Amino acid sequence: MTRSDLPGLTDLHAYPYAVHWHGPAGSALAYIDEGPPQARPIVLLHSVPTWGYAFRSVIPWLVQAGLRVLVPDLLGCGRSDKPPEPAAHGLGAQLNSLSQWMQDLGLHNTTLYGQGLGGLLAFRLAILQSERVERLAL
């Protein structure tokens, strides 16, 4: 397992959000959680090979609109763990990780937004977690 400790991924002026962790060591998701905890959640899912930083300009607007904004870095991307096994970066592993994350955070009435691979993951999550997802934007 490799966790990114590159200086370029920390202390970013345009991305001043606290990093939270979910999952076991070696396959933990890094994510940000901004806005009121009881507000309606929106989950922003990035494409590959980028990371949550791609959403830096929209996060403040969504928080200002009164939403709870959650932005996970997919496994193998950004600040999330980078398991050495190729299968750990596959669609199934990403879906399992994100599904468990949504369950453990108790997300409901969630809007999922995805771009690129994040769009495919959002679509699949909307099916797998239909009781938690209210809206889908691709």
Summary of predicted features, one role per range:
Residues A54, Q94, L125:
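Acidic donor-diphosphate engagement hotspot in glycosyltransferases and nucleotidyltransferases
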Residues G26, I32, V71-Y113:
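Active-site loop/oxyanion-hole signature of alpha/beta-hydrolase fold enzymes
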Residues L107-L138:
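Conserved hydrolase catalytic core segment
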Residues I32-D81:
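Conserved HGGG/HGGXW glycine-rich cap/lid loop of the alpha/beta-hydrolase fold
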Residues M1-I42, Q64-L67, L107-H108:
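Alpha/beta-hydrolase fold catalytic core
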